[in-house]
């Protein structure tokens, strides 16, 4: 299955996913690199994680406007190819370090070097990364999802800060 994004607009909607929490994935829907449109939280069992996550993405209200998924998965808990197949969206697996034994493509910017893997053409991925990387060590979709994942934000009820459930 091949995906194509014909034009990459300034306000492309990207779903950034972070898997730093145990049995939970937090996502941020970001428009370009400047606007946060929404937050997605999915509790995942250990088995069938990518398939369950993809079905939750398909059921979300943000799905019709999403153009790609940016995955920050330092523990390699999800299979990007399976997520891409079930969600029917291209996946950009982004990391600050190159994975051992893999030759991921490198993207260089003023903020540093980012290694990525995707089935999209390198020119399209580079354009998406240049539009969404505005500050910090990761592009905004993955960075916001990572901040949410590392915070003590109680996303269950959509309110305030509090202890993790």
Model-derived segments and their meaning:
Residues 18-20, 71-74, 96:
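Structural motif
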Residues 9-12, 64-66, 87-89:
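Short coil/turn connectors at secondary-structure junctions
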């Amino acid at each position: 299955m091949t995906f194509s994004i014909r034009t990459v607009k300034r306000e492309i909607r990207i779903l950034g996913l972070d898997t730093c929490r145990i049995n939970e994935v937090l996502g941020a829907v970001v428009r370009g690199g400047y606007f946060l449109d929404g937050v997605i939280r999915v509790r995942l069992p250990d088995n069938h994680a990518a398939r369950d996550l993809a079905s939750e993405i398909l059921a979300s209200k943000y799905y019709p406007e999403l153009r790609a998924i940016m995955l920050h998965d330092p523990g390699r808990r999800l299979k990007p190819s399976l997520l891409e197949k079930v969600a029917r969206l291209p996946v950009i697996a982004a990391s600050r370090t190159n994975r051992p034994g893999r030759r991921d493509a490198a993207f260089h910017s003023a903020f540093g070097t980012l290694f990525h893997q995707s089935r999209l053409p390198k020119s399209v991925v580079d354009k998406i990364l240049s539009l969404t990387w505005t500050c910090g060590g990761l592009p905004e979709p993955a960075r916001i999802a990572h901040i949410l994942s590392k915070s003590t934000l109680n996303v269950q009820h959509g309110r305030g800060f509090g202890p993790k459930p």
